Amino acid sequence: MATIQSETDCYDIIEVLGKGTFGEVAKGWRRSTGEMVAIKILKNDAYRSRIIKNELKLLRCMRGLDPEEAHVIRFLEFFHDALKFYLVFELLEQNLFEFQKENNFAPLPARHIRTVTLQVLRALARLKELAIIHADLKPENIMLVDQTRCPFRVKVIDFGSASIFSEVRYVKEPYIQSRFYRAPEILLGLPFCEKVDVWSLGCVMAELHLGWPLYPGNNEYDQVRYICETQGLPKPHLLHAARKAHHFFKRNPHPDAANPWQLKSSADYLAETKVRPLERRKYMLKSLDQIETVNGGGAASRLTFPDREALAEHADLKSMVELIKRMLTWESHERISRDKNAGHSNPPRSDKGPAPDKTLRPDPELFDSGSCPGEWLSEPEWTLEGVRGPRAQGLAPRHSHPHGPSRTTSFLQHVGGHH
């Protein structure tokens, strides 16, 4: 068993949890406290030094946050030797992708998606106070803390791709966000802000219900095509301003058309790039409203005598879809706001760790208006059963999951680049 030592502590390496292209994550025992920790280990070279420097800057900016209240991973320390860099974090249980995979990608009930959503929105609100854009929100970067003791309590992890907004706002074509969760303004080359994280969270919410990514594009053209086929084309003024519009759209040859732009066809894209567009969607939705009908959604409305649980799940699902629609908008200014007062209530804590979030309440100012989505998150009854997985509803994937047979441990995702 290897041992590594910082200036103030000593860690016994128990096992390697995951490996990536440039490093690994290990489970370690912290001798000073007797707690298990996660240690991200990277080679000590100039390239990784730049990566580490950015992540450390962000983690130090977050020092003032309460990790339990803000739902972000607790950072313990950084140290290095001649060969390796070491970042030490609290040890969490598993990420949402691993949880989905463990449960055969069965749909998660809307009440549990609500629990997760509120906590991540709170994390984003706290990050906004620090002018931080996470820029890589996805199921792998949302971790379950302790599913047995605190079901569906989560924390946001991996700030290796995060940025201070003032430092990146003028970057013309930032390469941020994993493709499935990449916001339209990044795809099209438009000005962006922290609302890119809201788009990503909307995609994650849909994926937790569908058991499959909403927009699993093989490349940026497929990504834009999928969004257009479900949500329609962006408004003309967006495409006029978009630096990358010509990558995906062309001028409409009909001068009287309502939209002077049209999406390039798959044949157009193949002729231009020699890359054949692929179909990787499990559900080819014609609108976001159709999310509600997938995996038994709306079943309660078809029953003659639905029980209370079925009716509650149906109402939850309808409200969830309304919220997703407010998060997945072409224009970022139309997305829900992450107000600075969002979710100010502190969850209960004890010496044994965080207690279940039975007292979690969102602040009404989280949203721009008191519409249905806000009411959905304000529901006072939080169902927190001690179960490890969602009810086994829905179909297993019909073909290989678009994320591939395995994804490296979350901490390492940013090191290998975005897909």
PLM regions: where:
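Conserved N-lobe ATP-binding subsite of Hanks-type protein kinase domains
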Residues: 24
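A conserved loop-to-beta-strand element in the N-lobe of protein kinase catalytic cores
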Residues: 81-90, 97-98
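Conserved catalytic-loop aspartate of Hanks-type protein kinases
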Residues: 197
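C-terminal lobe substrate-recognition/regulatory segment of protein kinase catalytic domains
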Residues: 236-323
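Intrinsically disordered, low-complexity regulatory tails and linkers that flank structured modules
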Residues: 349-419
